[in-house]
């Protein structure tokens, strides 16, 4: 059963007749009730997929993972390709598409960008509700003609990122990407609805220093930490350098240079 924070009671419900079976599946899997009149959130099964809706007055709109349409799809088509700062941060360059572990996957937006540029991605999300949204979005994306091949490069793991990284037995990723949620100081009322919706569920990643330490021990080439542009670095080792954007900053912890894979000559010459 999910350990729910104070003020974050969640129920599961179907908004379409055909979604009742799926709602029952998620309720059983997540240990959540199908009926709770006092719930603060509803995980809803709809014709368009799984979504999370905050309940009550002034609640932001529902959030779901959609790699086919909307903002994520627009970014894939018009977002700048390999010229994007995130691409530079993880080391994408001609002949280099590093394997990346996104240890704070969230809704998978950054991971999808990297997968669309040719990287193989492992994703870890520890909050079960967010992981459910991401799993549902990945399943729908795999069935889409346009993005199916991209989503096929994204492999989801659910659990505590630090524990998974420390117990990693597969080939180590070349790059580990972190975007931890830190104590909220933003005064702007136009904070993204995902942030407004998830903060009561997720809280702050107070174990970010331990996550950085684990990531530095596993990544073979670099660790990348995404931060608000004016925010302090994570406590611990200082980054080697940073890439600054208008609102975000990427702190780079280099370990080894990323180089193009050598092309072998099989011609027999």
Swiss-Prot record:
Localisation per UniProt entry: Cytoplasm
Q: Which UniProt keywords apply?
A: Cytoplasm, Methyltransferase, rRNA processing, S-adenosyl-L-methionine, Transferase
A Pfam family name for this chain? SAM_MT
Kindly indicate whether the keyword Transcription belongs to this entry.
no
Molecular function in Gene Ontology:
rRNA (guanine-N2-)-methyltransferase activity
- Give the EC class as a word: transferase
Q: Which InterPro entries match?
A: 16SrRNA_methylTrfase_J (IPR007536), SAM-dependent_MTases_sf (IPR029063)
Catalytic activity, per the record? guanosine(1516) in 16S rRNA + S-adenosyl-L-methionine = N(2)-methylguanosine(1516) in 16S rRNA + S-adenosyl-L-homocysteine + H(+)
Q: Which residues form a coiled coil?
A: none
Record SUPFAM superfamilies: S-adenosyl-L-methionine-dependent methyltransferases
Could you confirm whether the keyword Transcription regulation appears in this record?
no
Q: What is its EC number?
A: 2.1.1.242
Residues reported to bind S-adenosyl-L-methionine: 125-126, 179
Q: Which Gene Ontology cellular component terms are annotated?
A: cytoplasm
Family to which this protein belongs: Belongs to the methyltransferase superfamily. RsmJ family.
Function field:
Specifically methylates the guanosine in position 1516 of 16S rRNA.
Q: Which protein is depicted? A: Ribosomal RNA small subunit methyltransferase J
The organism of origin for this protein: Pseudomonas savastanoi pv. phaseolicola (strain 1448A / Race 6) (Pseudomonas syringae pv. phaseolicola (strain 1448A / Race 6))
Q: Which gene encodes it?
A: rsmJ
